[in-house]
């Protein structure tokens, strides 16, 4: 269910236009890089069109509220939207210093040409942020993350949660 009072933003890799406002399915943006120009607030949603494939990074920092999370997910019908990181990326999706955020119904891939230390699919980072509340990761298909096989610090991971600093 869509939280009341929020703004939906839409991204459509096939039919979108980065010069549009992104505020409706008909005026969807084309690229994930366009989403870096907005501030997501309580009740807002960032929705990627199903059956779309995005080559790029999804980087989000958002502060929702209890009962009014920021939702990053999918719209339309068909398979989950797929985000494939560029070759030398350490992550595909970065959720940084956020509260009350739900990430759902996405396919996340970070293959790269060769194995790489610290490569991950979804990275949740809290840095000098204190306590982060209610980060929900749901119905994600994370696969082909070609990270290092080291099973300690420096290894690869599908989901990596890091809390450092104060």
Question: Could you tell me what each predicted segment is?
Answer:
Residues 11-49, 53, 59:
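Acidic Gly/Asp/Thr-rich repetitive segments characteristic of extracellular carbohydrate-active
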Residues 1-6:
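N-terminal pre-domain segments of enzymes
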Residues 7, 44, 56, 68-70, ...:
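The right-handed parallel beta-helix/beta-solenoid scaffold, focusing on the short coil/turn
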Residues 49-50, 63-117, 144-150:
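Right-handed parallel beta-helix/beta-spiral solenoid domain characteristic of secreted/periplasmic
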Residues 86-94, 115-128, 150-166:
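Extracellular beta-strand/beta-solenoid scaffold signature
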Residues 56-57, 110-112, 127, 140-146, ...:
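Surface-exposed loop/turn segments connecting beta-strands in extracellular beta-rich domains
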């Amino acid at each position: 269910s869509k939280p009341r009072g929020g703004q939906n933003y839409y991204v459509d890799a096939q039919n979108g236009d980065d010069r549009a406002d992104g505020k409706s399915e008909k005026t969807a943006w084309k690229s994930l890089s366009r989403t870096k120009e907005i501030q997501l607030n309580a009740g807002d949603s960032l929705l990627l069109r199903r059956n779309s494939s995005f080559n790029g990074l999804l980087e989000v920092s958002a502060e929702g509220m209890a009962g009014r999370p920021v939702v990053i997910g999918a719209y339309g019908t068909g398979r989950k939207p797929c985000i494939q990181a560029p070759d030398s990326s350490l992550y595909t999706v970065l959720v940084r210093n956020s509260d009350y955020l739900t990430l759902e119904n996405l396919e996340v891939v970070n293959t790269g040409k060769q194995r790489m230390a610290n490569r991950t699919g979804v990275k949740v980072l809290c840095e000098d942020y204190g306590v982060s509340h209610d980060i929900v990761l749901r119905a994600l298909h994370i696969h082909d993350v070609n990270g290092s096989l080291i099973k300690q610090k420096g290894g690869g991971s599908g989901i990596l949660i890091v809390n450092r600093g104060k």
